Amino acid sequence: MAAIPSSGSLVATHDYYRRRLGSTSSNSSCSSTECPGEAIPHPPGLPKADPGHWWASFFFGKSTLPFMATVLESAEHSEPPQASSSMTACGLARDAPRKQPGGQSSTASAGPPS
């Protein structure tokens, strides 16, 4: 069984992306209040993520990202998908009899195979 990493390694990963490489602190286990590093400014044009809650929009349908709102809004006003003619041509129609593992059709009689 693989070992679960300690919370210290998660803090170190978090701090790596939040601080510049030339930070005065070399201790990766300290928190942001204990080791004030130089914060990386947020790039313009990118949406700001809500730390710890970015995944909630995928489960509850609320989106803070503009491109996700466009996709969700267009999906609400569109009609439900329907089977195309190519699916019917491939033998996936609902009326087609289903084959059982022995090569028999499900609509065949219960008698012995001939």
Curated annotation (Swiss-Prot):
Residues 23-33 have a biased composition (Low complexity). One of its GO terms (biological process) is liver development. It holds the Pfam family PPDFL. Residues 102-114 have a biased composition (Polar residues). GO terms for cellular component: mitochondrion. Probable regulator of exocrine pancreas development. This is Pancreatic progenitor cell differentiation and proliferation factor.
